[in-house]
Structure formats: structure tokens, C-alpha cells
């Protein structure tokens, strides 16, 4: 992977995450600045997706902890670097925990 491809992949996944939240009907605020997507839930908790270009990783900070994701070229998914869990599953779980709603993240 090169840096251009990495940034394109992260831009695309952040847009997919924004779209899923927009479609969810949850009362939240989304801010995407400097390559960092911040989701602020009504209760004040946050979910943060940030890019780590030197490592070609996507990092997620949630109430339950910090998670590092690598892009899997074979499946076309971002997967947790230790458990191999897809990004969408972690986002679903974190959103349920922090926002109280079951939001699907198709294709993630």
C-alpha cells in the first residue's frame, strides 16, 4: 500500500461511517477535520476515528478503549490488528454502548 491509497481508503471509510450515522436518526454531531472523524453522542460520549499514516492504520477511540485497524486487501475490510474483527462490528458495538442504538455499518 502507498500513502495515496491509504488516504483514499480512510476517506472512503470515514464517509461510509458518516452516511451510516446520518441515516440512523440518532441525535449526534459529526465533525470531520484534519482526517479525524469525531462522533459526539447526545450523552456527551465520543467515538473518534483517526488515521495513522506512518503505520497505514485507522485508529478508533471509544468509551471501551482504543483499537487499531489494518486494511485487509483480500476481504476489502478494515480489521482489528489483534482480533481481526471488522471495523463495522466494533462500530456497531460502540454505538450501541455509547448511543443506545443498534446502527448497522454495511460493507465495513
From Swiss-Prot:
Taxonomic classification: Bacteria, Pseudomonadati, Pseudomonadota, Gammaproteobacteria, Pseudomonadales
UniProt keyword annotations, A-Z: Iron, Metal-binding
Pfam family, one: Frataxin_Cyay
A single BP term in Gene Ontology: iron-sulfur cluster assembly
NCBIfam families found in the cross-reference section: FeS_CyaY
Domain of life the protein comes from: Bacteria
GO cellular component terms, A-Z: cytosol
Name the record gives this protein: Iron-sulfur cluster assembly protein CyaY
GO molecular function terms attached to this record: ferric iron binding; ferrous iron binding
Family: Belongs to the frataxin family.
Biological role stated in the UniProt entry: Involved in iron-sulfur (Fe-S) cluster assembly. May act as a regulator of Fe-S biogenesis.
Encoding gene, per UniProt annotation: cyaY
Organism: Pseudomonas paraeruginosa (strain DSM 24068 / PA7)
Amino acid at each position: 500500500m502507498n500513502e495515496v491509497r491509504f488516504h483514499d481508503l480512510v476517506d472512503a471509510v470515514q464517509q461510509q461511517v458518516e452516511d451510516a450515522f446520518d441515516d440512523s436518526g440518532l441525535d449526534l454531531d459529526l465533525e470531520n477535520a484534519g482526517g479525524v472523524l469525531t462522533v459526539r453522542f447526545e450523552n456527551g460520549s465520543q467515538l473518534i476515528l483517526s488515521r495513522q499514516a506512518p503505520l497505514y492504520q485507522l485508529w478508533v477511540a471509544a468509551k471501551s478503549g482504543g483499537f487499531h485497524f489494518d486494511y485487509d486487501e483480500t476481504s476489502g475490510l478494515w480489521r482489528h490488528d489483534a482480533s481481526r474483527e471488522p471495523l463495522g462490528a466494533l462500530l456497531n458495538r460502540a454505538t450501541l454502548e455509547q448511543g443506545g442504538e443498534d446502527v448497522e455499518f454495511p460493507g465495513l
